[in-house]
């Protein structure tokens, strides 16, 4: 499974979320791949993923449809990782 965080340096909520996602990346390092995409530097990728707000986080399971969250809390992200990606 993969978690993709679309963020920007000028986005306050994005900057507050980064340390939380880094903690999650450490906690789940052997189970989930975490990626960060700087929206200002990767505009074409943002268009491909239809990014309209920041932060936007994609949770992509091995099987099934991706889950997209915009502006959710870190607690919600952990819930998605545990219940949807890792099926705990």
Feature names for model-found ranges:
Residues 1-9:
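Short active-site neighborhood of thiol/selenol oxidoreductases, capturing the structured segment around
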Residues 1-2, 28, 76:
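Preference for well-ordered, secondary-structure-rich cores of eukaryotic proteins
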Residues 6, 18-25, 29-43:
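Thiol-based oxidoreductase modules, predominantly thioredoxin-like and allied folds used
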Residues 11-14:
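Hydrophobic heptad-repeat coiled-coil signature
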Residues 43-44, 75:
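Acidic phosphotransfer microenvironment of two-component signaling modules
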Residues 48-52:
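A short glycine-leucine-enriched loop at secondary-structure breakpoints
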Residues 53, 58-88:
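Non-catalytic, surface beta->alpha helical segment in thiol-disulfide oxidoreductase systems
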């Amino acid at each position: 499974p993969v978690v993709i965080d679309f963020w920007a340096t000028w986005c306050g909520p994005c900057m507050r979320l980064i340390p939380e996602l880094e903690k999650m990346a450490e906690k789940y390092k052997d189970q989930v791949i975490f990626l960060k995409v700087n929206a200002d530097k990767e505009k074409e990728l943002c268009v491909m993923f239809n990014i309209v707000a920041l932060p936007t986080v994609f949770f992509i399971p091995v099987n099934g449809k991706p889950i997209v969250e915009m502006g959710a809390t870190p607690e919600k992200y952990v819930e998605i990782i545990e219940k949807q990606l890792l099926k705990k």
